[in-house]
Amino acid sequence: TLEPSSAASDVYKRQHMRDATLDEVFIVLSIGASLISTLGLLANSSAVVIGGMVVAPWIMPLRAAAFAILLGEVRLLGRSLRTLLVGVLSTTLLSFLLGSVTGLPQFGTEVLARTSPNLLDLGIALVAGGLATYAKLRSDAVSSLAGTAIAVALVPPVCVMGLLLSHQSW
């Protein structure tokens, strides 16, 4: 494992511990992102889906998990994964409930496009991850860029998972 050797490492460690914490801000933003993204998927509106991605807070515990793995910080990794699990499960549940309540007979292209990932989707995820890392390392980069980048890859597909479960489409 890597050993933190400076005050900067301690600052990063404290920051990542905060980022990994399951708190009210994470829950409210996750629920908001889930509702906006799911409603956008149901309305077949890419603009609304993007709106949901902008508020998703999942980059914070993901970044903390990566930091924990690099330093061998098991406690931080556990906290990060628990926070992410709550985000994924709450998003899946909310999407499932919205899909069940609306009772749409079929889904539009926004949902269907996320049921058959391809290499282009992988490329988008890799570029988004690279931009998220760049934004974290450069304090002058737009801070919302990191959250949006990771949300591109995660929030809408998790919403689609809940919607497909509501239609019993495995």
Which residues does each PLM region occupy?
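Cytoplasmic-side transmembrane-helix entry/capping segments in multi-pass membrane proteins
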Residues: 78-89, 144-153
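Alpha-helical transmembrane segments of multipass membrane proteins
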Residues: 34-39, 65, 96, 130-134, ...
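Structural signature of hydrophobic alpha-helical transmembrane segments
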Residues: 46-59, 113-125
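C-terminal ends of transmembrane helices
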Residues: 62-78, 82, 130-142
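Single conserved hydrophobic/aromatic residue that forms the stacking wall/gate
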Residues: 1-8, 12
